[in-house]
A protein has these predicted regions:
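C-terminal motif of bacterial Sec signal peptides marking the signal peptidase cleavage site
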Residues: 14-17
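Sec-dependent signal peptide recognition
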Residues: 2-8
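Compact, glycine-rich, soluble single-domain proteins
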Residues: 19-157
């Protein structure tokens, strides 16, 4: 009788262990969620507003290093703006960034000096500004094309 009970418990324990070993944890798909509490405007050559963007501000080293890494989605009218202490050549990459982005480099006088359109997610390729920049604006891919934003335009923060 004890033998049958012992064997029964072993069988139950074995089945339970096998059942748990095939269960896989789903990776979190949430990602980071941002608050877009600031706004900026893109201006045409006459100073008219072409588009307005809500944005999360990254103005310290930790925020700039984190950027949009692990952000899985953004509203169409939202992005992130990186503020640097000095105007100098900048270079970004897409490491750990699941979204395709438009990256706009902006000089200290608020002129867009270069734009990278529809960047490749997770890429470690360097995307240099080419000219000195004090600000970098990241938006969803296609934002600059759909809003007719071009190099030489001004940004009003």
């Amino acid at each position: 009788m004890l033998n049958k009970l012992f064997i029964g418990l072993l069988v139950v324990a074995f089945i339970n262990a096998c059942g748990n070993s095939t269960k896989k944890e789903e990776p979190s798909k949430k990602g980071r969620v941002l608050e877009y509490t600031n706004t900026l405007s893109f201006l045409d050559e006459n100073g008219n507003v072409v588009s307005t963007l809500r944005f999360e501000k990254a103005d310290d080293p930790a925020e700039r290093n984190q950027g949009l890494m692990d952000v899985n989605s953004m509203p169409a009218d939202a992005g992130m703006v990186f503020y640097f202490d000095t105007e100098e050549p900048q270079s970004f990459w897409m490491m750990n960034t699941p979204l395709s982005l438009d990256i706009m480099y902006v000089s200290a006088d608020s002129t867009i000096v270069s734009i990278y359109k529809s960047t490749t997610p997770f890429s470690d390729k360097s995307l240099p500004s080419g000219k000195p920049a004090k600000y970098v604006i990241e938006t969803n891919a296609g934002y600059s094309i759909s809003n007719d934003i071009k190099e030489g335009m001004k940004v009003r923060f």
